[in-house]
Regions:
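Bacterial N-terminal signal peptides that target proteins for export
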Residues: 1-7
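Solvent-exposed loop/turn segments at secondary-structure junctions
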Residues: 65-68, 95-99, 125-130, 162-163, ...
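C-terminal cap of thioredoxin/glutaredoxin-like
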Residues: 5, 147-222
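Sec/Tat-exported extracytoplasmic proteins
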Residues: 62-65, 80-83, 110-114, 123, ...
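Extracytoplasmic thiol/disulfide redox context detector
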Residues: 8, 13-98, 213-222
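Structural microenvironment flanking redox-active thiols in thiol-disulfide oxidoreductases
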Residues: 85-145
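Extracytoplasmic/secreted envelope proteins and their assembly/folding machinery
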Residues: 73-80, 103-107, 120, 137, ...
Length: 222
């Protein structure tokens, strides 16, 4: 389990996830399953309902300013290429403070404008490599203009009810899931998986796949 980011920074020193303190690893209990609750994943106390019950829902909680989220992107891309049709994936931005809420609004604005796929790598690159935090109004206007989005169009969508509501919903989800660090993967609103020492970045999506299959078996028998 990870811990909450107290001061947003590009220079995060945690080993596996964007967090400010370590948590003692829980002892592995005897189990016939490959991965163990409390060690490799957590059960969410107050689970959320999925949008489409016919699919297993996988959601990544992330922040553009988190270098571990940036490092996870190629792993995520490979996993998505092999993602079964009965699994859905989406991103949900973290919203702990005003900077993160600005980035969450930026993300949902790009999504509403239909430029999400090209926007994500560009935003990560700008913040992580160019060290420009993309928080000022003028800076964001020019950034979106780089995607051929007119300034007034950007401003209109950025302040729209739809984008504001999306940010609010992301904030509610994050609190309900008790997210204390990113990146974190939520499986079917029930399970929380982070790149802890017990999991690591390489093993993260193996745990996700394990939980996806677990949910499929559960659905088949209920």
């Amino acid at each position: 389990m990870t811990s909450r980011i107290l001061i947003p920074s590009l220079l995060v020193l945690a080993l596996f996830s964007c967090s400010s303190e370590d948590t003692a690893q829980v002892q592995t209990s005897l189990s016939n399953e490959k991965y163990t609750q409390g060690v490799h994943y957590e059960l969410i106390d107050n689970p959320t309902t999925v949008r489409d019950p016919s699919k297993v829902e996988v959601i990544e909680v992330f922040w553009f300013g988190c270098n571990h989220c940036y490092a996870l992107e190629p792993y995520l891309a490979r996993w998505k290429k092999e993602m079964p049709e009965d699994v859905s994936f989406s991103k949900s931005p973290a919203t702990w403070n005003e900077m993160l809420k600005t980035h969450a609004r930026m993300y949902y604005t790009a999504k509403a404008l239909g430029i999400e796929q090209q926007f994500i790598p560009a935003a990560f690159n700008t913040i992580q490599n160019e060290r420009r935090m993309l928080t000022g109004n003028t800076e964001l206007e020019y950034f979106f203009m780089g995607f051929d989005i007119e300034r007034e169009k950007y401003k209109s969508v950025n302040k729209s009810f739809g984008v504001s509501n999306a940010v609010d919903q992301a904030d509610k989800r994050m609190k309900q899931w008790e997210i204390t660090g990113v990146p974190v993967i939520i499986v079917n609103g029930k399970y929380r998986v982070g790149a802890s020492r017990a999991v690591g970045t390489d093993g993260l999506f193996d745990v996700v796949n394990f939980l996806v299959e677990k949910e499929k078996r559960y659905s088949a028998t209920n």
